[in-house]
Amino acid sequence: MSNFNNFEQVEMKVKAAQKLVGYATMSMDHQQLTDATDAINQARSQLEKMKTLATDLDEEFLVKQEEELTQVEQQLREAQI
């Protein structure tokens, strides 16, 4: 798989995590919260993988994805308190 596709995967996984966290925090359903946590973990894993392959040109994109993922992680943590 090309790096371009891997970067697209980062963005898709972050967006999926955002949606799942949104649904889970509205419903507070245990399974949805678990699924949202899994989606965050998958997005984080893909993001960390791509950081090792990134060039300076990729940094802005990765920083944006990191910020969005961190925000959604915080949203999920707050919902679970």
Question: Where is each model-derived feature located?
Answer:
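Acidic (E/D-rich), amphipathic helical modules within compact regulatory domains
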Residues: 49, 54, 64
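A structural signal for well-ordered alpha-helices, especially hydrophobic packing surfaces
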Residues: 18-25, 44-47, 51, 69, ...
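Short, charged, amphipathic alpha-helical segments
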Residues: 30-41, 59-68
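Short amphipathic alpha-helical heptad-repeat segments
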Residues: 9-13, 35-44
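Charged low-complexity stretches with an acidic bias
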Residues: 3, 7-10, 57-81
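N-terminal acidic leader/helix
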Residues: 2-31
